[in-house]
């Protein structure tokens, strides 16, 4: 049976999803509250992981070890790295990599974590398809599929943005996705990252982010609800085959 883990970083990203859940039982582990219940007919576990890569990875491991999730979705907001991506647009991850991991001194490619067999951690094709369909249902014509670039930094500087684009060729930047992707990858749990654009990751970001944070986060939560429904339909169809 499919059991979907949904991870958000902040209150604004998870409050809408929690309000849509039924049969909710909440458990606190390692400082985070895990809400187990049903979303759009699908068993889910929803957690607010907090900001940053360590918090995100910790919650993924708990979801895998303590709740037995079979699939993972990271929902939230991000800064645009692409001129064609405007505030309110949506990004579905093809893969995710770190923009602040650099072992090039030792001969590794930029972003490569020693011991890993990939630089960018690939999303699951089925989840990607479900996420894209859900995003297009909410905001037709405003969804891009591509790379999510992650680091422990809120990007509000055009020079930093330009460097991240050069190093990663990412579509958007945020602070949790690649850590979630790496932890899911190491646990062989399929994942996808879903991001709504809240700012342009440049010198306008400090002004745009507070204004559009809630709008972007609620849009992403709406897509996550539809994604759960798509996953339920997909697993039901697979069971019938």
Predicted region positions:
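Conserved small/polar residues in nucleotide/adenosyl-binding loops
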Residues: 234-239
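N-terminal short beta-loop-beta anion/metal-coordinating cradle
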Residues: 2-67
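Regulatory input/activation interfaces that engage signals or partners
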Residues: 191, 196-233
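Mid-sequence, gly/pro-rich, charge-dense loop/helix-turn segments that line enzyme active sites
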Residues: 81-168
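Alpha-helix C-terminal capping segments
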Residues: 62-66, 84-85, 182-190
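A C-terminal functional module that forms or caps the active site or interfaces directly
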Residues: 155-193, 198
């Amino acid at each position: 049976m499919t059991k979907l883990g949904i991870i958000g970083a902040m209150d604004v990203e998870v409050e809408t999803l929690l309000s849509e859940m039924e049969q909710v039982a909440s458990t606190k582990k390692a400082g985070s509250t895990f809400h187990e219940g049903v979303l759009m007919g699908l068993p889910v576990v929803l957690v607010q992981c907090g900001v940053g890569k360590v918090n995100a990875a910790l919650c993924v491991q708990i979801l895998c070890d303590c709740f037995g999730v079979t699939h993972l979705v990271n929902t939230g907001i991000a800064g645009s790295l692409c001129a064609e991506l405007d505030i309110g647009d949506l990004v579905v991850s093809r893969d995710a990599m770190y923009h602040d991991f650099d072992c090039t001194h030792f001969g590794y490619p930029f972003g490569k974590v020693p011991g890993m067999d990939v630089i960018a951690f690939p999303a699951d094709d089925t989840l990607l398809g479900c996420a894209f369909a859900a995003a297009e249902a909410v905001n037709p014509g405003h969804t891009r599929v591509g790379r999510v670039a992650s680091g422990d930094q809120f990007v509000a500087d055009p020079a930093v943005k330009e460097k991240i684009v050069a190093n990663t060729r990412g579509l958007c930047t945020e602070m949790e996705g690649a850590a979630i992707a790496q932890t899911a990858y190491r646990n062989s749990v399929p994942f996808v990252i879903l991001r709504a654009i809240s700012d342009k990751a440049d010198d306008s970001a400090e002004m745009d982010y507070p204004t559009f944070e809630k709008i972007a986060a609620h849009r992403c939560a709406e897509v996550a609800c539809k994604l759960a429904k798509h996953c339920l339909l997909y697993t039901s169809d697979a069971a019938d085959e």
